[in-house]
């Protein structure tokens, strides 16, 4: 019987010698699951936010800090995991991160007050983001920029099941158990990913390139070099601001849909899943576009649609046109644009990073979740009487994404 190390060596040799255009199915599923840590950890418990507020007697704006603390943890944790993945390989940091994610999820299930839950959500994010960082680095290890954009689109298809299925699952869990059972389900998800990484995922860090880093100073130097690269920063911020608008929607939609428009908690997943289908469909159509267009040209057009959708959403919220059905239209358009923006911005940002792909992936994630934290907090702080705070933040994120791309990258192709 083959040992795990033998399987790893076999896949390493296979991946190095074959001109792969897509990863093996098991590899694709594991990477998709790792990249789904954020949507799973967020979307699964969204239907439970009102129940959490009721049990702890907390204001909805306070409960939303369980989201903000998660975003902060995702931003800070990635700058730790990235250099570790470049120095020690892709798999060891994954083992540690996934293990602590399981423990933090169990802790969330037994939290006795809202403050403890907020802190444990932070721990959950710091540990779980290892999967997100390293999954992106693994793709960069094996593919060029153009092919990477196609692979990221495939991964969005896999990870896109999370925002479709998770709210449904969370809502149905609430029909039979308390919100605490949702976090036990997350612990099982983390454990399954840990086993999958151990059993099937090969080590992919390039063996012919010296490991980067030698401590905090070396890591900071790498981050400084990356931030001085205008194109890297422009692509990272274009993707980051666009996804921050998506997180503003994730933060605000439970209150808007359930509390303001009276959608039952167990039906919330239908609306959330509808928008997620748009994101998945656009990410897959992106693969077809990339057969005869550059990732940069697709990204340019997607940025314009992001601005259009955000401003239309703001107008609908200000004027109060048509209630929830009309509000859903620009939200859907915005998420469709994310499906074009996210894979192409990521692929171009990581295109020439080589052995420091882990650090570059981490910095992208930190920038993305840093602005997502601000966007999420703004939705909570701007008030809860209408959809306007959510709409204003989404529109602002779309404009900032467009501005970052135009100012730092410009109009050329990658």
Predicted segments, located by residue:
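A late C-terminal transmembrane helix in Major Facilitator Superfamily
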Residues: 347-385, 393-394
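Helix-to-loop junctions at the C-terminal end of transmembrane segments
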Residues: 78-88, 282-297
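Cytoplasmic helix-loop-helix junction between adjacent transmembrane helices
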Residues: 120-161
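Helix-breaking motifs and short loop linkers at transmembrane-helix boundaries and internal kinks
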Residues: 55-57, 89, 110-116, 127, ...
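Paired small-residue
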Residues: 100-107, 115-123, 325-331
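Conserved MFS/SLC helix-loop-helix module at the cytosolic interface between two early adjacent transmembrane helices
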Residues: 76-115
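Helix-loop-helix hairpin linking two adjacent transmembrane segments in secondary transporters
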Residues: 116, 153-199
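Flexible cytoplasmic inter-helical loops of multi-pass small-molecule transporters
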Residues: 198-224
């Amino acid at each position: 019987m083959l040992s795990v190390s033998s399987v790893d060596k076999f896949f390493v040799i296979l991946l190095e010698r074959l001109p792969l255009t897509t990863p093996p199915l098991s590899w694709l599923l594991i990477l998709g699951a790792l990249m789904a840590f954020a949507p799973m950890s967020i979307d699964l418990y969204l239907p439970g936010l009102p129940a959490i507020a009721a049990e702890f007697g907390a204001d909805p704006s306070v409960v939303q800090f369980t989201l903000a603390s998660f975003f902060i943890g995702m931003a800070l944790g990635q700058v730790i995991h990235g250099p570790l993945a470049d120095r020690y390989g892709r798999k060891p940091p994954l083992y540690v991160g996934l293990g602590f994610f399981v423990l933090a999820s169990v802790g969330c299930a037994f939290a006795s007050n809202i403050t403890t839950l907020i802190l444990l959500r932070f721990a959950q994010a710091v540990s779980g983001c290892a999967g997100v960082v390293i999954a992106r680095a693994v793709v960069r290890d094996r593919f060029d920029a153009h092919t990477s954009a196609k692979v990221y689109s495939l991964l969005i298809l896999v990870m896109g099941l999370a925002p479709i299925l998770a709210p449904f699952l969370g809502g149905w869990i609430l029909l039979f158990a308390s919100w605490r059972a949702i976090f036990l389900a997350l612990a099982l998800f983390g454990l399954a990913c840990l086993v999958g990484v151990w059993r099937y995922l090969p080590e992919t860090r390039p063996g012919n390139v010296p490991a980067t880093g030698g401590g905090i100073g070396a890591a900071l130097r790498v981050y400084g070099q990356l931030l001085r690269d205008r194109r890297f920063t422009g692509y990272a911020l274009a993707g980051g601001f666009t996804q921050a608008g998506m997180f503003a929607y994730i933060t605000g939609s439970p209150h808007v849909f359930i509390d303001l428009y009276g959608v039952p908690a167990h039906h919330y997943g239908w609306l959330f899943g509808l928008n997620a289908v748009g994101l998945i469909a656009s990410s897959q159509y992106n693969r077809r576009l990339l057969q005869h267009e550059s990732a940069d040209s697709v990204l340019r057009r997607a940025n314009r649609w992001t601005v259009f959708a955000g401003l239309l959403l703001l107008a609908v919220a200000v004027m109060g046109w048509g209630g929830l059905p009309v509000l859903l239209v620009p939200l859907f358009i915005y998420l469709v644009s994310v499906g074009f923006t996210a894979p192409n911005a990521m692929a171009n940002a990581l295109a020439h990073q080589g052995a420091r792909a882990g650090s570059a992936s981490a910095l992208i994630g930190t920038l993305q979740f840093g602005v997502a934290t601000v966007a999420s907090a703004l939705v909570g702080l701007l008030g809860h009487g209408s959809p306007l705070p959510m709409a204003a933040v989404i529109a602002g994120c779309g404009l900032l994404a467009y501005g970052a791309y135009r100012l730092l990258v410009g109009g050329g192709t990658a």
